[in-house]
Amino acid sequence: MVNTCGFIGDAKEESINTILEYAAHRRSGDVRRLYVMGCLSERYRKELPAEIPEVDAWFGKMDWSGIVSDIARQFPATVPYDRIITTPRHHAYLKISEGCDRFCAFCAIPLITGRHHSRRPEEIVEEVRMLTERGVREFNVIAQDLSAYGRDLNSAKQSGLADLVNRIADVPGVDWIRLHYAYPADFPHDLLRVIADRPNVCNYLDIALQHISDPVLKAMRRHVCLLYTSDAADDG
């Protein structure tokens, strides 16, 4: 199973080289089956099968049911946990949403991941509980756009990020919460109060400002301006 990235040139090159390496093993019989998944497979799923026929199946970024059913048919097995941790056991990445609706001029993420959709808060909190029972103490909360979390889950289109972080912070055993990849436009300012009030929410916030020049921001389709960014920084 080769997991790929199709976002930047170096990552695409590394992904292709890895697929070709295992395609050679597939031809020689050293590998019984070869599957490819992830961003590259999602973005170029029409072109790649003809170029690399040794791959038995190509799966897009969200083809979870297809991956599971195909592998289960070929390799029946029992997996002891819903999630396998690949980081050091004390910390884990916690993805709370997938996709992006921003469509910045320079970014391919919406083409790869599709439109933004949030995970249900109950599902996320349950995953946190499961992971803390296995020894995880630090959670890196990630998404392509943290600022948009929850807007698709309520009719008022309001962010649910602050409430979600509070609920994660309430879970026994959670020592650190660190927030990654917020978008400056529509940033939920009530989150700043949560960061200030909760001792297990780190004084850390990853926001991609990208630029401060209004003409450049307009060309980039970033939907913010110098004044907005300055006001947001003052509020912080």
Task: Show where each model-derived region lies.
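Single conserved hydrophobic/aromatic residue that forms the stacking wall/gate
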Residues: 228-236
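Gly/Pro-rich active-site loop or hairpin
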Residues: 192, 218-223
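N-terminal [4Fe-4S]-dependent radical SAM core
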Residues: 58, 63-94
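Conserved Radical SAM active-site core
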Residues: 12, 92, 113-201, 211-213, ...
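Cofactor-cradling patches in redox/metallo enzymes
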Residues: 2-66
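Canonical Radical SAM [4Fe-4S] cluster-binding loop centered on the CxxxCxxC motif
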Residues: 89-122, 236
